[in-house]
Amino acid sequence: MFSLKRQQGASFEQQARLFLESQGLQFIAANQNFKCGELDLVMLDGETIVFVEVRQRKNDHFGSAVESVDWQKQQKWINAASLWLATQNHSLEDTDCRFDLVAFGATASNVQWLKNFIE
């Protein structure tokens, strides 16, 4: 079950990457893991580094994909982005970046792209 869930997650992350590339973003990295959390995708939109969280929900019984990104998850996302930037000799303070959410429903065609999900 865990392996199937991981495979499905990887599939939706790939769909998100393709979707974002079709919107003009450039791929930088995927699945960047840190103790504090993971960055699903790191993309470039012009001069802006975009940290992308990919979420999928088959139904809304336990909340939507968007609702699943709570305050605690947002903090992990920000911390992981900060650590990733440090590996590039940058910081959140000196880098033009944003946090986008790509949320899927039951299928890859049911997609929402929420730019600046974390302000």
UniProtKB/Swiss-Prot annotation:
User: Domain of life, per the record?
Assistant: Bacteria
A GO molecular function annotation here is: nucleic acid binding
Transmembrane parts of this sequence: none
Kindly name one Pfam family recorded for this protein: UPF0102
Entry's family note = Belongs to the UPF0102 family.
Entry-linked NCBIfam families: PRK12497.1-3 (NF009150), YraN family protein (TIGR00252)
Protein name as catalogued: UPF0102 protein MS1289
Name the source organism: Mannheimia succiniciproducens (strain KCTC 0769BP / MBEL55E)
